[in-house]
Design a protein with these regions (language model features):
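A compositional/structural signature for long, glycine/proline-rich flexible linkers
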Residues: 1-142
Length: 142
């Protein structure tokens, strides 16, 4: 079996077991609506993971909306009607130029997090640039 095939099967096995987090044990739900919400949450997490880690091109990274108040498939970890979060995995060996427009944002930052081991959640901020560190032109471009 190829490494890709093994990884795919491992993903499917993991997905197959994830619903036990809300179907079994002391936090189990029985209401159809709550069960549907659990599956919706799993699908949302999978969608974010695929968009952030499977589809990006390392040579041309793009920011992916991972939490917005308007996309229902990108509302996870708690709603925040005032914030938009984007993610962009990068190669620590490369340099990047980020440009955009701050729009009507009250606060804007670019934050880099570590990856303690492949696939692990970050546990440390390794760099941050806040809007007070960025030069904007008259139209809000940077």
């Amino acid at each position: 079996m190829t490494e890709s095939a093994a990884a795919w099967r491992e993903l499917l096995d993991t997905l197959r077991e994830l619903d036990t987090s809300f179907l079994e044990g002391p936090r189990a739900v029985t209401d159809d609506r709550q069960i549907a919400d659990g599956y919706r949450m799993l699908a949302t997490g999978l969608g974010v993971a695929l968009d952030c880690y499977l589809f990006p091109e390392p040579g041309r990274p793009q920011f992916v909306a991972v939490n917005t108040p308007t996309r229902h498939d990108r509302r996870w970890g708690g709603d925040n009607t005032d914030a938009y979060y984007h993610m962009c995995p990068i190669d620590p060996e490369r340099k990047y130029r980020v440009f955009g427009n701050k729009g009507d944002s009250v606060y804007l930052s670019l934050t880099a997090y570590n990856e303690p081991s492949p696939g692990a959640w970050s546990n440390k901020v390794v760099a941050i640039i806040r809007d007070t560190d960025i030069e904007f032109d008259a139209d809000g471009n940077f």
